[in-house]
Protein backbone atom coordinates (compact mmCIF):
# COMPACT_ATOMS: atom_id res chain seq x y z
CA UNK A 1 0.00 0.00 0.00
CA UNK A 2 1.42 3.41 -0.91
CA UNK A 3 1.56 6.24 1.64
CA UNK A 4 -1.48 8.15 0.34
CA UNK A 5 -3.59 4.98 0.32
CA UNK A 6 -2.46 4.35 3.91
CA UNK A 7 -3.48 7.87 4.91
CA UNK A 8 -6.89 7.65 3.20
CA UNK A 9 -7.67 4.21 4.60
CA UNK A 10 -6.84 5.48 8.10
CA UNK A 11 -9.54 8.17 7.99
CA UNK A 12 -12.89 6.82 9.17
CA UNK A 13 -16.09 8.06 7.55
CA UNK A 14 -18.99 8.56 9.96
CA UNK A 15 -22.39 8.89 8.23
CA UNK A 16 -25.01 11.33 9.53
CA UNK A 17 -22.64 13.12 11.90
CA UNK A 18 -22.93 15.81 13.16
CA UNK A 19 -26.28 15.89 11.36
CA UNK A 20 -28.25 13.80 8.89
CA UNK A 21 -26.83 13.90 5.36
CA UNK A 22 -23.26 14.71 6.41
CA UNK A 23 -20.43 12.18 6.19
CA UNK A 24 -17.88 13.22 8.82
CA UNK A 25 -14.25 12.48 7.94
CA UNK A 26 -12.69 11.55 11.28
CA UNK A 27 -8.97 12.34 11.54
CA UNK A 28 -8.75 10.90 15.06
CA UNK A 29 -8.45 7.45 13.52
CA UNK A 30 -5.51 8.73 11.44
CA UNK A 31 -3.87 10.16 14.56
CA UNK A 32 -4.23 6.79 16.29
CA UNK A 33 -2.11 5.21 13.54
CA UNK A 34 1.44 6.56 14.01
CA UNK A 35 2.59 5.28 10.61
CA UNK A 36 -0.25 7.06 8.79
CA UNK A 37 0.11 10.22 10.91
CA UNK A 38 3.84 10.38 10.17
CA UNK A 39 3.17 9.74 6.47
CA UNK A 40 0.77 12.70 6.37
CA UNK A 41 3.33 15.03 7.96
CA UNK A 42 6.15 13.71 5.75
CA UNK A 43 4.09 14.22 2.58
CA UNK A 44 3.32 17.85 3.40
CA UNK A 45 6.94 18.51 4.37
CA UNK A 46 8.19 16.94 1.11
CA UNK A 47 5.87 19.18 -0.92
CA UNK A 48 7.02 22.43 0.71
CA UNK A 49 10.67 21.80 1.57
CA UNK A 50 12.99 24.30 -0.13
CA UNK A 51 10.04 26.37 -1.43
CA UNK A 52 10.95 29.58 0.38
CA UNK A 53 8.35 29.24 3.11
CA UNK A 54 9.30 31.35 6.16
CA UNK A 55 6.45 30.52 8.58
CA UNK A 56 3.75 27.91 9.02
CA UNK A 57 0.32 28.95 10.29
CA UNK A 58 -2.17 26.48 11.76
CA UNK A 59 -5.87 27.17 12.21
CA UNK A 60 -7.75 26.26 15.37
CA UNK A 61 -7.76 23.56 16.32
CA UNK A 62 -6.99 20.61 14.08
CA UNK A 63 -4.62 22.73 12.02
CA UNK A 64 -2.40 22.76 15.11
CA UNK A 65 -2.12 18.96 15.03
CA UNK A 66 -0.65 18.94 11.52
CA UNK A 67 0.87 22.41 11.28
CA UNK A 68 3.16 22.24 14.31
CA UNK A 69 5.01 19.06 13.24
CA UNK A 70 5.26 20.38 9.66
CA UNK A 71 6.83 23.61 10.95
CA UNK A 72 9.20 21.65 13.20
CA UNK A 73 10.29 19.37 10.35
CA UNK A 74 10.88 22.40 8.10
CA UNK A 75 12.76 24.22 10.88
CA UNK A 76 10.29 27.12 10.78
CA UNK A 77 8.27 29.13 13.30
CA UNK A 78 4.70 27.95 13.92
CA UNK A 79 1.96 30.57 14.31
CA UNK A 80 -1.48 29.93 15.82
CA UNK A 81 -4.73 31.32 14.44
CA UNK A 82 -7.35 31.01 17.17
CA UNK A 83 -10.92 31.76 18.11
CA UNK A 84 -11.43 35.05 19.99
CA UNK A 85 -9.94 35.67 23.44
CA UNK A 86 -7.53 32.71 23.37
CA UNK A 87 -4.29 34.60 22.62
CA UNK A 88 -2.61 36.69 25.36
CA UNK A 89 -0.86 39.45 23.38
CA UNK A 90 -2.30 42.13 21.10
CA UNK A 91 -4.23 40.54 18.22
CA UNK A 92 -5.72 41.27 14.84
CA UNK A 93 -9.21 39.84 14.15
CA UNK A 94 -11.10 38.71 11.06
CA UNK A 95 -14.77 37.70 10.97
CA UNK A 96 -16.16 35.39 8.32
CA UNK A 97 -19.52 33.90 7.36
CA UNK A 98 -20.59 30.41 8.31
CA UNK A 99 -23.52 28.47 6.89
CA UNK A 100 -25.62 29.82 9.78
CA UNK A 101 -24.04 32.88 11.34
CA UNK A 102 -20.54 34.23 11.69
CA UNK A 103 -17.26 33.35 13.36
CA UNK A 104 -14.05 35.24 14.10
CA UNK A 105 -10.38 34.29 14.03
CA UNK A 106 -7.45 36.06 15.67
CA UNK A 107 -3.65 36.04 15.51
CA UNK A 108 -0.97 37.95 17.38
CA UNK A 109 -0.07 41.27 15.77
CA UNK A 110 3.64 40.47 16.01
CA UNK A 111 3.52 36.92 14.64
CA UNK A 112 3.88 37.77 10.92
CA UNK A 113 6.59 39.97 9.46
CA UNK A 114 6.48 42.05 6.30
CA UNK A 115 7.05 39.74 3.31
CA UNK A 116 6.87 36.47 5.27
CA UNK A 117 5.99 33.65 2.86
CA UNK A 118 3.42 31.71 4.86
CA UNK A 119 2.14 28.16 4.45
CA UNK A 120 -1.29 27.66 6.04
CA UNK A 121 -2.01 24.13 7.29
CA UNK A 122 -5.37 22.66 8.30
CA UNK A 123 -6.83 19.18 8.50
CA UNK A 124 -9.60 19.61 5.93
CA UNK A 125 -10.54 21.84 2.99
CA UNK A 126 -14.30 22.16 2.57
CA UNK A 127 -15.62 25.61 1.54
CA UNK A 128 -12.36 27.47 2.17
CA UNK A 129 -13.93 30.05 4.50
CA UNK A 130 -11.52 29.50 7.38
CA UNK A 131 -8.46 29.71 5.14
CA UNK A 132 -9.83 32.79 3.37
CA UNK A 133 -10.20 34.54 6.76
CA UNK A 134 -6.75 33.32 7.84
CA UNK A 135 -5.18 34.66 4.65
CA UNK A 136 -6.79 38.06 5.25
CA UNK A 137 -5.18 38.20 8.70
CA UNK A 138 -1.75 37.28 7.33
CA UNK A 139 -1.99 39.73 4.45
CA UNK A 140 -3.10 42.57 6.74
CA UNK A 141 0.17 42.05 8.62
CA UNK A 142 2.20 42.19 5.40
CA UNK A 143 2.71 38.46 4.87
CA UNK A 144 2.19 36.54 1.65
CA UNK A 145 -0.03 33.47 1.43
CA UNK A 146 0.37 31.50 -1.77
CA UNK A 147 -0.07 27.94 -0.46
CA UNK A 148 -2.27 26.00 1.91
CA UNK A 149 -1.91 22.32 2.78
CA UNK A 150 -4.61 19.92 3.93
CA UNK A 151 -4.77 16.26 4.81
CA UNK A 152 -8.32 15.97 3.43
CA UNK A 153 -10.04 17.73 0.55
CA UNK A 154 -13.78 17.73 -0.14
CA UNK A 155 -13.80 19.02 -3.74
CA UNK A 156 -17.60 19.01 -4.05
CA UNK A 157 -17.77 21.91 -1.56
CA UNK A 158 -15.76 24.33 -3.72
CA UNK A 159 -12.93 25.29 -1.38
CA UNK A 160 -10.16 24.78 -3.91
CA UNK A 161 -11.79 27.15 -6.41
CA UNK A 162 -12.46 29.72 -3.68
CA UNK A 163 -8.81 29.69 -2.62
CA UNK A 164 -7.61 29.93 -6.23
CA UNK A 165 -9.72 33.10 -6.60
CA UNK A 166 -7.71 34.72 -3.79
CA UNK A 167 -4.34 33.53 -5.09
CA UNK A 168 -3.84 30.47 -2.91
CA UNK A 169 -2.86 27.08 -4.31
CA UNK A 170 -4.29 24.22 -2.26
CA UNK A 171 -2.40 20.98 -1.71
CA UNK A 172 -4.44 18.04 -0.39
CA UNK A 173 -3.17 14.58 0.41
CA UNK A 174 -6.45 12.72 -0.08
CA UNK A 175 -9.92 13.61 -1.35
CA UNK A 176 -13.39 12.32 -0.57
CA UNK A 177 -16.61 12.83 -2.52
CA UNK A 178 -19.60 14.50 -0.90
CA UNK A 179 -19.82 16.50 2.29
UniProtKB/Swiss-Prot annotation:
Main location, first listed in the record: cytoplasm
One Gene Ontology MF term: adenine phosphoribosyltransferase activity
Keyword Cell division appears in the UniProt entry: no
GO biological process, one term: adenine salvage
SUPFAM superfamilies: PRTase-like
Enzyme Commission number(s): 2.4.2.7
Coiled-coil ranges per UniProt: none
Keyword Cytoplasm: yes
Pathway(s) served: Purine metabolism; AMP biosynthesis via salvage pathway; AMP from adenine: step 1/1
Catalytic activity: AMP + diphosphate = 5-phospho-alpha-D-ribose 1-diphosphate + adenine
Annotated function: Catalyzes a salvage reaction resulting in the formation of AMP, that is energically less costly than de novo synthesis.
Protein name as catalogued: Adenine phosphoribosyltransferase
Organism: Haemophilus ducreyi (strain 35000HP / ATCC 700724)
Amino acid sequence: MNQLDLIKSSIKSIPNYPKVGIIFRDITSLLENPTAFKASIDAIVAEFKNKGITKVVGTESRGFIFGAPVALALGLPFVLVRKPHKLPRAVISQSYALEYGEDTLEMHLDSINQDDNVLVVDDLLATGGTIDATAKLIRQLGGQVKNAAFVIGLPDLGGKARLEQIGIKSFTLVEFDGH
